[in-house]
Regions:
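Bacterial Sec-dependent N-terminal signal peptides
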Residues: 1-28
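Beta-propeller blade termini and top-face loops
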Residues: 26-549
């Protein structure tokens, strides 16, 4: 595994300078610090056992053993042997968050990457444009759209590899940026904005007509995220069509929702190029799955199903079988499948055979039962259309929110709270010559892991957290977990917890804990009892009355 040691050194220098700048009498020898930092090397201690959030999957048409996996906040990984081993190929670039990856169908050495995840959560990573590799990921060139922040999809014209479309969602937390549908006709040297809606609306998905790439479909998405809420949708969201390779566009409306729309996923199939599918976030009975049988000119509402979980903004990807136009897969908490052209959907398998929260799916064009699925828990493969799955436990891409270290000797341990992977505990080193292995890590608490802490005097006592302020004290010797979340008194209003609530152990008394909801709590007995130290410290405003856009 490779790491960017120069970037790490720069960050270390910046940190030291920042901390020391208040001490005006102190002189800093930058050259000495830089020399010391360059000698530091990062090493991987995992874990890979749980995977991490996959944003996109690309498989070479010319050599199906070559796969690229785009990770929400873990770069781009490549395998040349069907997943037996992996190599990170994007570590030296300036963005760690990937939203889309595409392989040139005419030359598998040419790979395009769109940085910045294509979801709208508070935890989303953003990017710095579009990258291109001409040597299978060995080297990269940043080609443009530096202010796009989030790329939904990249499409390469199969007739001319210099023609590439990029769906740029634009910044999530603000207006403007590089937003809309962009096109290059010179392999990324220059870019033209061919579909511009407004400063708040980007493009989240695009598809070619499989029989005629001059026909392009695009899904526009109006959105805005604030700390207190997400506005997913608006009057400018919708489905657009071009019949001249992106030169002119028309917004389609016949049969589509009359009200405002949110995130839209599109899909086409070479089995019948007249059919276009769309899953549309909308209000009430207008939401759901839509089908066109005349290349997007008019649409019919099939049902009201849309992706659920934390909201359609987190999913909405759909894929259609290349050989059966009625066979559709929709990404959701559990993958859903329709075998009747979108009229009915059901969970693929039981949904429990693999990790939940799915974002990407590849269908083998030679064997429709062979699928690759990317989820919050990493990459999975099935050869029986989801009846059984195998996980790839060799991708160390978990997204850690917080971590803490204990005071064990000779090697300290780490506890980390990870997105959708729970809380994990593992050693910093082992006596094994192979280093830290998957088997050295374990998961004492599931769900999403957040703030955590070892008791500084007793490394067998660990505090771990689940979303919404659920706090657990865990005994590593007995493997007993106890819920110690503070509770309001009789007659008091319910506590309002952050998704990631703050926890602190007093440096003066290891029995004393501080924990935060809308007020500050203190425990002097390791969480067995709690006392509120403050009133409501928030403004207690109704978030629905705050301006969103």
């Amino acid at each position: 595994m490779s790491y960017n040691n120069h970037s790490f050194g720069f960050l270390l220098i910046f940190f030291i300078i920042s901390v020391s700048s208040s001490v005006k009498s102190q002189t800093i020898d930058i050259a000495t610090i830089a020399d010391a930092a360059n000698g530091l090397k990062m090493r991987s201690i995992g874990p890979a056992v749980m995977g991490g959030r996959i944003a996109d999957i690309a498989v070479s048409e010319q050599d199906p053993s070559n796969w690229y996996v785009a990770v929400g906040s873990g770069g781009l990984w490549k395998t040349s042997n069907n997943g037996i081993s992996w190599k990170p190929v994007f570590d030296s670039q300036t963005s760690y968050s990937i939203g889309s990856v595409a392989i040139d169908p005419n030359n598998s050495q040419v790979v395009w990457v769109g940085t910045g995840e294509n979801v709208s959560g508070r935890h989303v990573g953003w990017g710095d444009g579009v990258y291109k590799s001409n040597d299978g990921g060995i080297s990269w060139n940043r080609t443009g759209l530096f202010k796009s922040q989030h790329i939904g999809k990249i499409l390469i014209d199969p007739r001319n590899s210099d023609v590439v479309f990029v769906a740029a969602e634009g910044p999530l937390w603000s207006a403007g940026g590089d937003r809309g549908l962009y096109k290059t006709i010179d392999g990324g040297k220059t870019w033209n904005l061919v579909l511009e809606i407004d400063e708040n609306t980007g493009v989240t998905d695009i598809e070619f007509d499989p029989s005629n790439p001059d026909i392009v479909y695009a899904a526009a998405y109006q959105r805005r995220r604030h700390v207190w809420a997400l506005l997913s949708g608006g009057p400018k969201s919708g489905i657009y069509k071009s019949s001249d390779n992106g030169e002119t566009w028309s917004k389609k409306s016949t049969g589509l929702p009359k009200g405002e729309m949110g995130k839209i996923g599109l899909a086409v199939t070479s089995a019948n190029s007249d059919i276009v599918y769309a899953t549309i976030e909308a209000e009430n009975s207008e939401k759901g799955f839509y089908k066109s049988i005349n290349k997007g000119e008019s649409w019919e509402h099939q049902n009201e199903y849309i992706s659920g979980g934390t909201g359609p903004h987190y999913y909405q990807e759909i894929e259609v079988s290349p050989s059966n136009p009625d066979l559709i897969y929709q990404m959701d908490v559990f993958i859903r499948v329709s075998r009747d052209g979108g009229k009915n959907f059901k969970v693929l398998g039981t949904g429990r055979e693999k990790h939940s929260d799915n974002h990407a799916l590849w269908i083998d064009p030679e064997n429709g039962k062979h699928l690759l699925a990317g989820s919050d828990g990493g990459l999975y493969e099935t050869f029986d259309e989801g009846s059984t799955w195998r996980h790839f436990p060799n991708l160390p891409i978990a997204q850690f929110y917080k971590l803490d270290l204990d005071n064990s000797e000779p090697y300290y341990n780490i506890v980390g709270g990870a997105q959708d992977l729970g809380s994990l505990i593992g050693p910093s080193r082992t006596m094994n010559t192979e280093g830290v292995r998957n088997s050295d890590w374990y998961v004492p608490l599931g769900a999403d892991g957040y703030d955590n802490a070892f008791d500084p005097e007793d490394p067998n006592t660990v505090y771990m957290e689940i979303q919404e302020g659920n706090l657990v004290r865990y005994d590593r010797l007995t493997e007993e977990g106890m819920d110690i979340q503070p509770q309001p008194g009789l007659g008091e209003m319910a506590e309002r917890w952050n998704w990631d609530s703050p926890l602190l152990i007093s440096p003066h008394n290891n029995k004393r804990l501080y924990y935060g909801s809308q007020r500050l709590w203190r425990s002097d007995d390791q969480g067995n009892s709690w006392k509120s130290l403050s009133p409501d410290l928030t403004t207690n405003r109704n978030r629905y009355e705050l301006e969103m856009m």
